[in-house]
Amino acid sequence: MLRRKALERLAAWKRDKTTQALLVDGARQVGKTTVIEEFGHTYYEHLVELNFIDNPEALSAVQKANTADDLFMAIAAFAQDELIPGKTLVFLDEVQACPDVVTMVKFLVQRYGQYDYVFSGSLLGTGLRGIRSVPVGFLDSFTMYPLDFEEYCMARSVSNQALEEVADAFRNRRQVNPAIHQRMTDLFHEYLIVGGMPAAVDAFVKTHNVQQLRLQQQSIVDQYRRDISQYADNLADARAIRRIFDLVPAELNQQNKRFRITQVSKGTRLSREEDRFLWLADAGVALPVYNVDEPRYPLMLSMNSRLFKLFLNDVGLLTCMCGMDVIRDLLNDRTDINYGALYENAIAQELKAHGFNLFYYKNNSIGELDFVIEYPHGYVRPIEVKSGKSYKRHSALTKALNAENFGIRKGTVLAETNTQCEGNIDYLPVYMVSQFRNE
């Protein structure tokens, strides 16, 4: 079974909660159900699980509930395990099929607080828009993402000692042990192909068969397309959203990687088109990276919501959509070819999984910074991502560091190199993005 950091997050909720239920959201196929089931079996004597898509009778019963008593009675009627106070986890899955159940959490935990409750579902960003209210103070939540790079390394049997070597090298800005550095670099190249979708990772780890891997990935891509058709508001929106989704690989291959709304459907109001882009983001399928007018803290103040790059939630799916030629090049370590979009997609999903908001900066006089992230203490970090050998060519980063009004102390280049620190620029191995959350 794949080791997921979300299990630690669930355990922390159980340890620290007072009366809150927990909502786990995230895109389809990122492993929510599996992790919550593992959590239930590990930390509780009993697990009562209702899936509102697999069990339409349970869905119908819950939809008819008007009170906490009605809801609990419906849960008990379809429970396949015992409801024992203090020893049972109640897991309601696919709650996007019954979003109003979330509004009843407050009354459920107040009336039947001797049980723990976890809700989960996909497309919650779109499916929960119409609910009456979300109970503030009675619902904790977090978002799950595909396996991050460290989780992928654990799936590939990388030792804790090797991971700690990377972490220590990052803390002390020193070079990683050469053997470990080579292993991590090779695994990062592999991660660009496999990505972090659990079904894809599991298939590759067990078989090392790229064809089996692509079957799993293509199945997920097809599922996302079906979800768009099923859950979009109308046929016109479904067609436009599917076109945006299918255009992501081609758009990321453009020099500026920015979406041009006119390429999707000419003549459509900008606000309508924005909603279609946001549908993919709300569903967890895509990761928008917004432009900022100034790379200064707080970045949100200068965000331009109508100018953004759009990445997929998983680099493996992007590589799958790009075709076998790209996979062959990566398998043959032909990283000299310009696959910057794949590298940037991997960096975007890693940063997002670790809680960073995603921004980039572009200015005619300075140029473009691939990513700009911020820390709570007011520190802004500009990041350049380099997939080729000329990683020390970064005029935009140099100009941004020299701009006194920005007040940026240090910049980072993520590249195919071991650690090098020169002046106010840190050249770090591209896989070391996994450590940024620890700074």
Spell out what each predicted region is.
Residues K32:
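Conserved lysine of the Walker
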Residues M1-W13:
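N-terminal pre-Walker A segment at the start of P-loop NTPase domains
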Residues V205-Y379:
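Accessory nucleic acid-recognition modules appended to NTPase machines
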Residues F170, E416-E439:
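Domain-level recognition of nuclease-like catalytic cores that cleave nucleotide substrates
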Residues V24:
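Hydrophobic anchor at the beta1->P-loop junction of P-loop NTPases
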Residues D54-P85:
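Short glycine-rich substrate-engagement loop in P-loop NTPases that contacts/grips substrate
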Residues V35, F39:
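Hydrophobic positions on the alpha1 helix immediately C-terminal to the Walker A/P-loop
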Residues R129-N253:
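Interdomain motor-coupling "hinge/lid" segment immediately C-terminal to the ATP-binding subdomain
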